């Protein structure tokens, strides 16, 4: 009888531990979405462990860009450096890219992957871009920071 009670307590204790662990899994798996004062949103999908990208650094990235659907999901892919097999390089914070990129890539570490959700005001705005990006489009980019030169 005493042994049965001990086994039941052990099993109950293990069940509590398992349930607690399962409840924490979604929290650990979902990265926190950050919204900046400008309206840019980003999620670090992978935090790198290399140099930190700062304004005026020359950075090398791979990226894929999508139009955002009305429900917030990724829509049509419109560009990808990965598809071309050619990383994209630019001077960070110098206005060589859309504002959402200048803001969103800063603070990344080499090896990191960040999803940027860029509102129209930080992207191509009312004009759109080259018939590929419509006016007032919200853009989603997945950016991998490959290298930084200070």
Feature map (PLM): residue ranges:
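Cross-family detector of peptidyl-prolyl cis-trans isomerase
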Residues: 2-150
């Amino acid at each position: 009888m005493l042994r049965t009670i001990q086994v039941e307590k052990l099993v109950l204790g293990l069940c509590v531990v398992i349930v607690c662990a399962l409840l924490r899994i979604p929290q650990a798996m979902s990265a926190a979405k950050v919204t900046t004062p400008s309206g840019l949103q980003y999620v670090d999908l992978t935090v790198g462990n290399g140099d930190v990208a700062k304004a005026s650094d020359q950075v090398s990235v791979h990226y894929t860009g999508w139009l955002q659907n009305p429900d917030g999901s990724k829509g049509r892919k419109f560009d990808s450096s990965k598809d071309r097999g050619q990383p994209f390089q630019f001077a960070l914070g110098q206005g060589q890219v859309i504002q959402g990129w200048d803001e969103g890539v800063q603070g990344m570490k080499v090896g990191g992957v960040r999803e940027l959700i860029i509102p129209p005001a930080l992207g191509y705005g009312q004009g759109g871009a080259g018939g590929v990006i419509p006016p007032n489009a919200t853009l989603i980019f997945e950016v991998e920071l490959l290298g930084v030169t200070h």
